[in-house]
Amino acid sequence: MKLEHVDKGKAVISCENKKEFSQYLGYMHGGMVSAIADTAGGHAAATMLKEGYKTVTSELKIHFLKPVVSKKVIATGEVLSAGKRLIIVETTVRDEEDNMLAKMIATMFVIEPSK
């Protein structure tokens, strides 16, 4: 995975599709698609944090819209809502031709720095 771009409330991750990521039909495994989407959403959420704070995924829901057969996927994570304890993100996973492959919404839990 490669972090392509980060702005306040937004992050873009790309990932080359490799044989090791395939499920038995030859498509990218849903777990890998989820990991890419979660990573983009996590980076987007991290842009909203105060110094010393961290975030982890509390829950996520993903819709797989098309099988991933492209050589590369691009995941764009965007913050929908940022509160003191929870950050809600939405990530869209697309192929190189801009076809939507998956859509994820996730809740990120904010962890305060140790005292």
Where are these regions (language model features)?
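Hydrophobic/aromatic beta-strand elements that line small-molecule binding cavities or substrate pockets
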Residues: M1-K2, L60-I62, T91
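Active-site helix/loop of acyl-thioester processing domains in fatty-acid/polyketide metabolism
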Residues: G31-E51
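Catalytic strand-loop segment that frames the active site of acyl-thioester-processing enzymes
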Residues: M1-M28
